Regions:
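N-terminal leader/targeting and accessory segments in enzymes
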Residues: 1-97
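Phosphate-binding loop of NTP-binding sites
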Residues: 94-173
Length: 173
């Protein structure tokens, strides 16, 4: 397992989660995609327009997920899940709460990049330029929407000196 990213008790408290099962003390990452999940990650079963992360719990377990964050509403349909769970009212809202906790615990200088063109290029240029002055955390790929920004924040290491987030704007609010 990689370096600890989150203490599970702190995670559960931040997300207002109910623990179920034998939870690990820490997790090393946050994932919403079983194809990129690494052993020791917490898997967030986000429900989207075309998919439901709850359908991928078995794949997440096989990939090495340390725990699953699942919706209370989906719990009856899950049957007997062998992995530890953090049960929440809404998985995306819980991830947003964890993102708020990540921001609150960080002393990093935060840079938000937005606009209609060039966000990813600007974010990457800043990441490379700031790296000489300390540890930089930057959102992966173009994670700039209503789930990508909180996901990127939840992955913010405590010791990052800088954090760069790409923020898209596709509608008011």
């Amino acid at each position: 397992m990689n370096e600890a990213l989150w203490d599970v008790d702190a995670m559960a408290a931040a997300m207002h989660a109910r623990p179920l099962g034998d939870l690990p003390a820490t997790i090393s990452g946050i994932s919403i995609d079983t194809r990129t999940l690494e052993a020791g990650d917490a898997f967030f079963a986000i429900q989207g327009d075309r998919f439901d992360g709850h359908d991928f719990l078995t794949a997440a377990t096989k990939a090495g997920a340390a725990l699953h964050v699942v919706s209370e509403q989906k719990l009856p349909a899950l049957g007997r899940v062998q992995s530890p769970l953090l049960i929440v009212d809404d998985v995306l809202k819980a991830m947003s709460r964890l993102a708020e906790a990540a921001r609150a615990r960080s002393k990093a200088t935060i840079v938000a990049v937005t606009g209609s063109v060039g966000k990813t290029t600007t974010k990457e240029a800043l990441r490379h330029g700031l790296a000489a002055d300390g540890k930089v955390h930057a959102s992966a790929a173009s994670f700039n929407n209503h789930w990508g920004v909180p996901l990127s924040l939840t992955r913010l290491p405590r010791d990052a000196r800088f954090a760069i987030f790409e923020i898209g704007m596709n509608h008011p609010g």
